[in-house]
Structures are given as structure tokens and as C-alpha cells.
Design a protein with these regions (language model features):
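Active-site glycine-rich loops that stabilize anionic/oxyanionic intermediates
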Residues: 42-53, 128-129, 262-263
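Alpha/beta-hydrolase active-site loop
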Residues: 93-114
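Catalytic active-site module of serine/aspartate enzymes centered on a nucleophile-bearing elbow/loop
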Residues: 283, 287-322
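Conserved alpha/beta-hydrolase
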Residues: 57-88
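Alpha/beta-hydrolase fold nucleophile elbow
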Residues: 116-128
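Alpha/beta-hydrolase-fold enzymes
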Residues: 134-221
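N-terminal cap/lid segment of alpha/beta-hydrolase-fold proteins
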Residues: 1-35
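Short beta-strand/loop motif that positions the catalytic acidic residue
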Residues: 258-260
Length: 322
């Protein structure tokens, strides 16, 4: 008999002081067994989504984990998904959005963790931009995290991030933070698109499955061009996590799993992901594992071979349980 799963909404005031952050919790519909005994979760998994998407795209992965005993939650960042007042604001972030997003992630963790016993293990799963947020988050609030899965990450050279940040902030001053620069966007996500030969769309780089690409394009909550304020935030993030100091502030005893496709341009087809692995090891993180999936692009949770990824992540979490 299939487990009945329910979703519930959560909302709170963003650390920008104005936006309402919208989130989702996936959990079993029943909190007690047939004999009346409470149904205790094996752990909580908080999903930190990527750029120009929203957390409900992770529904299949979340349900997979709930069926295996976990509670799953996630929120739409400022400028994303259902956390915007209207769709014209998608992709609009302030230039100081880094700290806001990190603290909003922590706010959701505080809210959801309070619902369960203190001993319930808490995992963070960050994908793409969410992987950069997660890495910066661990440097600030990593204590008490049972483990982190860093998915679809990369390692931008620090000088490149700083140059991009300088340009984005210059445009913020001249045009305002909500201005959208096709030139800056071409330097950013456009660089990923150019790495895919014989591409049919500008977002073929996210997945080898055309149906996933088409669904992304058709989703009104996906694909918005980042404002120059958004790019200032993004390059602020990539610049911070490229530093040794950031990795050294991470908890050394929390296990980390790095996963990515070996055809993912965000991770330089594995090269950048290996640099992150080496960075974590050099910083003294005791348990770091890395797995690259042959032939997969950026969204490994949506690739035709995603079942292997789901199983690998769940098995890793099971081993990380105290």
C-alpha cells in the first residue's frame, strides 16, 4: 500500500523586511501508526533550490524521500517562485541578497526543526545556486546539521566572480538593481548554453531530456532573467564560496556529499566539482564524498537516470544518520 503524502504551505517574513517567503513541507498524511504509536521521521531534508526556478520542481524527489521515512521542506527564495508579489518581479533581487537568502534558509530550518524532536537529524540539500547558498550557509549555521548534499555546484575563479560583481554593482548604480542586462546574462547563464553542441533551446544545458527542458520553458515560474541586482547577489555568493576561509568555517564533522553530472557546464564538466572536493578536504572536513554521473547535465534529479541519483542520495543519508 502506497504511503499517503500530504503537502502543507509555510510562510514567513523574509529578512529583506518586505517579502513573504513561501515554502512547502512534504510529510506522511498520518503521524501515527495503525497501533497508535507516533510515526517518527528518520530525519528532515531541507531543499535549497537553484536560480530561476522554484522548490515545487523537486516534488518527485521530495516524495521519494518521504516514502523512505524523511520529512522534506523547502522555500522559494526572494525573487523566485511564489515568494514574489507578481511574476514581473521574478529574478529581481537586491544587490545584497546573499545574506537575505542565507538567513531565509535558516528561518525555515528553525520553523521546521521546531516541529520535531531535537534529536531528529537535519540534512540540507542544495542545488545549483542553492549549492552556493548551502556552502555559505554551512559556514554560518552549519552546527547541528547532520549532513549536506551539494548538487550541481561549481568553483568560479575568484577574480571572475569579483569582476562580475563589480560590473553588476556598477549597473545597479547606473540603471537600478531591477534593470535586466542581456549583456550580463549572456556572460552568466549564456556561457552555459554555449557549451551544448546542436542545442535546440537556450536551456538545453539543464538536462538531456527534451521533455524536462520543454517543461522548464513552459513553467511561468522558471527561466526569468536575473536583474543586475540578482547578478550582484549571485557573484557575491560564488566569490565567497571560492575562498578557503568559507570552507574553513564549515563544521568539520558534518559529512558532505558532492553530486553532479559530468556534462554539467556549471561544474565545468566535473573539473569545478573536484576543486570543491579538494577545497573541503584541505579545510579539514573529515567526511567528503564525490560522485559524478556520466552523461548527465545540470539537473541530475531530472535526468532519465535520476532513479540512481535518488537512491544514492537516500543511501548516503541513511549512512549519515546518527
Amino acid at each position: 500500500m502506497a504511503l499517503e503524502i500530504r503537502t502543507s504551505k509555510v510562510g514567513f517574513l523574509s529578512h529583506d523586511g518586505a517579502s513573504t517567503i513561501r515554502g512547502v513541507v512534504w510529510e506522511p498524511a498520518r503521524r501515527a501508526r495503525a497501533d497508535g504509536a507516533p510515526l517518527r521521521p528518520r530525519g528532515v531534508v531541507q531543499i535549497v533550490h537553484g536560480m530561476a526556478e522554484h522548490v515545487e520542481r523537486y516534488d518527485a524527489f521530495a516524495r521519494y524521500l518521504v516514502e523512505r521515512g524523511f520529512i522534506v521542506c523547502g522555500e522559494d527564495h526572494i525573487g523566485h517562485g511564489r515568494s514574489v508579489a507578481d511574476e514581473s518581479r521574478l529574478g529581481c533581487l537586491p544587490p545584497d541578497g546573499k545574506e537575505i537568502m542565507i538567513e531565509d534558509v535558516h528561518e525555515l530550518r528553525t520553523i521546521v526543526a521546531a516541529r520535531y524532536a531535537k534529536a531528529t537529524p537535519y540534512f540540507i540539500f542544495g542545488h545549483s545556486m542553492g549549492s552556493f547558498i548551502t556552502r555559505a550557509y554551512l559556514a554560518r549555521h552549519g552546527q547541528g546539521v547532520a549532513g549536506a548534499v551539494i548538487c550541481g555546484t561549481g568553483q568560479q575563479p575568484l577574480l571572475v566572480s569579483r569582476a562580475g560583481n563589480w560590473l553588476a554593482r556598477l549597473l545597479c548604480k547606473r540603471k537600478g538593481p531591477d534593470y535586466r542586462s542581456a549583456f550580463l546574462d549572456n556572460l552568466g547563464v549564456g556561457a552555459y548554453a554555449r557549451q551544448i553542441k546542436d542545442a535546440h533551446t537556450s536551456v538545453d544545458w539543464i538536462c538531456t531530456d527534451p521533455a524536462v527542458v520543454d517543461a522548464y520553458i513552459a513553467d511561468p515560474l522558471c527561466g526569468a532573467m536575473f536583474s543586475v541586482g540578482g547578478y550582484a547577489t549571485l557573484t557575491d555568493l560564488t566569490g565567497e564560496v571560492a575562498t578557503r576561509a568559507c570552507a574553513e568555517r564549515m563544521p568539520k564533522d558534518a559529512p558532505v556529499l558532492l553530486v553532479a553530472g559530468d556534462k554539467d557546464p556549471v561544474g565545468s564538466c566535473g573539473v569545478g566539482v573536484r576543486k570543491v572536493f579538494d577545497q573541503f578536504k584541505a579545510a579539514g572536513v573529515v567526511d567528503v564524498q564525490l560522485k559524478l554521473y556520466p552523461g548527465m547535465r545540470h539537473e541530475i534529479l531530472n535526468e532519465p537516470g535520476h532513479a540512481e541519483v535518488f537512491a544514492d542520495v537516500e543511501a548516503w543519508m541513511e549512512k549519515a544518520l546518527p
